[in-house]
């Protein structure tokens, strides 16, 4: 938190303790008939995919970890997210909340996990915008893996 002292509100500063590394961007584009999963997309590929998206499909972008604040800010800019939303995504100690904006809904949740006698929490942010879901997680492993596996099944009710 001390790294944010004196900065303007909306500054994209990561407050967690995960080592800074390039985020892994995974895109999942699906409808009732088809699903396409792309691993390790670059920001340029993400922009290209976003520009060619049609309204008949759902577009899920999952990003982790969020330690590379500049890349997260660029993704926020691509999807026209308010700078305060990007700041909250990067503030891993932020309390859970839900906020409704004109163009999207922003949600911060904490994922609790008990392992080896220790309770730990992961910071997860979600943005729901039209047919797009953006999910940002502070730590790996992927907390959404079971959901993704269910989406891959052709007869899944989730589609």
Residue spans for each PLM region:
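Peripheral, non-transmembrane regulatory/ligand-interaction domains of membrane transport proteins
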Residues: 1-159
